[in-house]
Structures are given as C-alpha cells and as structure tokens.
C-alpha cells in the first residue's frame, strides 16, 4: 500500500489516500496490454464490408451460348467470376471482428495501464470537482491549474452530468466513470485525473 496526494481543484493539497500496490504499482505487462488494446480496436470495427458473389450479381440467368459445337470454352453464365461484371470470389462479407479475452487478462491489462500512468507521473487524484452547474470555462481553469496536457482522461465515481457537460466542448478531454474505465482510453490519454472516490472504486474491483 502506498500513499498518494489528493489535490483540490485549485491545486492545493487536500490530503492523501492509501491505494493498493497490486492495482496501481505493478510491473506493467506489455504483451497483455498490447492484446487488450488490439481487442478493443477490433471491437470498434464496423465490419460492414461486402461484395457480390456470382449469385448476388444481377443478370446471367441465360446460358451465353450452347454447350457444344461452337469451338469456344463452355460457359454457364455471364456472371461467373472470370467474366467482366461477374461476381467476386471469396470477397469480404459482413462480420464481427470482436473476440474475447479471459477476465484475469483484462484485469491485468487495466492494472498495467494504471500502473504505467502512475510511473509516468501522469496520474492526478482530486477530492471532488464539485461543479454545481456545467461551466466549461471553470473546467478549463482546473486543467490549467493542475498543469494538464492536451489529452486528458477524467474519471469520476459515477456519472456526473455537470462534469461531462463542462468537458464536452474541450478538445482532447474525455470523461468516463470508474465502471467504464478501459485500457484504450487510458493508453490514449497523456494524463489521467481521477476522483478519490473513483480511485477507491477501481481499487475495489481490481484488487
């Protein structure tokens, strides 16, 4: 267990929180992390590609010429693959690219991504945002005060409409919940801001 500083949104120290090293301070497993990122990127693919095979191309119902006696090669339809305008052989069809990973591997990947951010000093814990109403300007001031880079992942314990609406119009800022935290979002962001309650919730699930 290690202690981490908890900051207020004005940048001052609010206190500290003790978090499990098994979640936030492991040696990142790069191969599992790579596999988890590939899994998520594959799941994002639409897979709607399609071409027409010989049965789907319009026309070609009549035999082009008789079977024997012409001296030419026998043909059954002008929509066969060797004809111009014919169907495609073994072309792409709609499919899902999603596949599964064991739960232990998925959790190891998340722990690795979190530990990587902590090791990079790209992990900031705040006590709470405390927005009473959506204020984009105030949220930008918070990011400036906490010296955050352009690509930031903000993690709250539960859905916080005021935080989501405040950050929605700021390029490079993404808001998610502790339950929705995933490897692709973590690795895509340059920095992570997480509330103390969200950090405890993540620890509870992954420990």
Curated annotation (Swiss-Prot):
GO cellular component entries: ribonucleoprotein complex; ribosome
Keyword Transmembrane helix: no
Region (Disordered): 55-75
GO molecular function: rRNA binding; structural constituent of ribosome
Entry keyword annotation includes Acetylation: no
Classification via Pfam families: Ribosomal_L4 (PF00573)
Any one biological process term the GO annotation gives: translation
SUPFAM superfamilies the record matches: Ribosomal protein L4 (SSF52166)
Domain of life assignment: Bacteria
Alphabetical UniProt keywords: Ribonucleoprotein, Ribosomal protein, RNA-binding, rRNA-binding
Composition-biased stretches (Basic residues): 60-71
Oligomeric and partner information: Part of the 50S ribosomal subunit.
Family: Belongs to the universal ribosomal protein uL4 family.
Job of this protein: One of the primary rRNA binding proteins, this protein initially binds near the 5'-end of the 23S rRNA. It is important during the early stages of 50S assembly. It makes multiple contacts with different domains of the 23S rRNA in the assembled 50S subunit and ribosome. Forms part of the polypeptide exit tunnel.
Entry protein name: Large ribosomal subunit protein uL4
Taxonomic path: Bacteria, Bacillati, Bacillota, Bacilli, Bacillales
């Amino acid at each position: 267990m290690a202690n981490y500083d908890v900051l207020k949104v004005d940048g001052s120290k609010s206190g500290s929180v003790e978090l499990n090293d098994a979640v936030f301070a492991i040696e990142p497993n790069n191969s599992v992390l790579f596999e988890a990122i590939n899994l998520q990127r594959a799941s994002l693919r639409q897979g709607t590609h399609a071409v027409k095979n010989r049965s789907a191309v319009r026309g070609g119902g009549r035999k082009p010429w008789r079977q024997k006696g012409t001296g030419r090669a026998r043909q059954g339809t002008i929509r066969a693959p060797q004809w111009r305008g014919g169907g495609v052989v073994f072309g792409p069809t709609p499919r899902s690219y999603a596949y599964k990973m064991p739960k232990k591997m998925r959790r190891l990947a998340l722990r690795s991504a979190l530990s990587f951010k902590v090791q990079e000093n790209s992990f900031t814990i705040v006590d709470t945002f405390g927005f009473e109403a959506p204020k984009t300007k105030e949220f930008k001031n918070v990011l400036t005060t906490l010296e955050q880079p352009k690509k930031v992942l903000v993690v709250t314990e539960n859905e916080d409409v005021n935080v989501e609406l405040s950050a929605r119009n700021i390029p490079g800022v993404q808001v998610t919940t502790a339950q929705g935290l995933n490897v692709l979002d973590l690795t895509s962001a340059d920095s992570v801001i997480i509330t103390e309650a969200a950090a405890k919730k993540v620890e509870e699930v992954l420990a």
